[in-house]
Structure formats: C-alpha cells, structure tokens
Amino acid sequence: MYTNKMISFVKLVFGVLGAIMLGTTPVWAHAANQGFVLLLPTTAYIAGGTVTVALTILLLIFAKPGAIDAVMQPVPLRFRASTLPLRDWSQSTGALCLALLILIGLRGPTDPQANLLPLVIWTVWWMLFFVVQALIFDLWSWINPFPAVHRILMSEHRVILNLPSRLSIWPAVVLMAAFQGFVLADTAPNDPDRLAVFALGYWALTLGGMTVFGREAWLKQVECFSVLFALIGLIRMGRSNRLGLPGWQLLQDRDHDLSHAIFVVII
C-alpha cells in the first residue's frame, strides 16, 4: 500500500522534473575536435587489439598464483649514474623552450598549420612523448619545465601549507578532466593564441601551487601531466638501475588506489 508520504514524494519528484523540462532552452553545439586518421590499415588495429585481449584472458585463466610475480622480477644492473645537476639544466632548457613556444603562439602566425606551438604541443609532446616515455626512458623528468622556474626563483622556499597525502592524486584527476574538457569541447583548441593563453595560465597555476604546497607534493599529487607521464613510465622496461619485462613496475609499486584508476579512465 502506498502511504501519503510516498505519494507526496512522487508528486514532488515529478513536479521538479516537470519544472526542469519547462525551463529548458535550445543550446549551441559544435563539431568538437578533429578525428584522428588511422594511417595503418584498420585490420592491423583490430587484429592487434583482439590478440592483446585474448592473450590477457588466457594469461589470467592459466597462470598459477604467484607465477606472474616470479616472471616479472626485475634484474639489477651494476651501474647507476648520478645525473641530478644535468637534469636541472635540461629542465631549465625545457622551460626556456616552452616560454619561446608561448611567445610564438601569441605573436606568430594565426594558422595552426604554420605556427610552431600547436605543432609541438599536439604532435611532438602529446603523441611522441607518450611513446618515448613508455618504451625508452623517462623523458619528462628531464625536460619538465615547471620545477625549473620555481627552483630558480625560490631555491630556499618553505612550504606554506601541507598537501594531505590522503588526497592521493584526486586533484590531478580534476585537472586532467578539465584539460580533456578543453581539448574536446573548446571550439578551437588548435588556435595558437588560445593555446598559448592556456599554457601560460596553467604554468602560472603550477608555479603558484608549488609555492604554496611545495614543489614535490604539487608535482606528485596535483600537476596532472607529471602524474600522467609517471604512470605511463610504469610500462617501461628500465628504471633506475633495474631492468625487467614491460609492466614489472606496476607489480613492484602497489601504492595505486581508486584515484589512479579514474585518472587512467579519463585519459
């Protein structure tokens, strides 16, 4: 039997829905971002994806407990070079290059095909870096432009506020979602002037965040591109002075939580 409270609640829900429907208005839409052209035959993509999924399922079915851990153990290497001073210089070079690209975006040609900023951002950085970071070496830690300026301007800076570790990388999830929204919903993400303003604003946000919460904490938990390339680097076979099969770092580093999973889904 329906009670008077249940009937009143149903009426309230339908009343709210009706008010929302009556208050709707037409909205503007656009064609979103351009599609990616598959240069290889489509059959190659389909076959590669099918084989990958099939092998993954077979591995999960027939692999004995602990067998994967034994196979994925890395082999220690006998050398480990200290490259910290050289990395500081390379990051400073990366910051200088980013500043020049932003200047080119603001003052250069308005045609995205003729301006260097969109070409470098969307072709070199957003595509080529993924391959290098995942297969060859940790390129992002060498050219990351964000810590370089902060290190130069505030070499002896003290943290103003502590970023709680329990937040994990949820702040980076929010920033990555905002970035993906810019790429997908903006009417002209390739426009040099618009892209330069976005890059400059994000650089200022990152510099301010590192000033308040500290360089290491901000880059590890909030700066979405540092988090992105750190996760991609977990696929790489080599790390520091160890070498193993692709993915061994994922088994060694078990500090990932739900925020990391959501971050990967957003990508």
Predicted features along the sequence, with ranges:
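A broadly tuned "polar low-complexity/structure-edge" signature
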Residues: 2, 17-20, 102, 231, ...
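N-terminal secretory/membrane targeting signals
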Residues: 2-29
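Transmembrane-helix bundle segments that line or gate the permeation/cavity pathway
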Residues: 18, 26-244
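Membrane-water interface at loop-to-transmembrane-helix junctions
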Residues: 163-170, 243-266
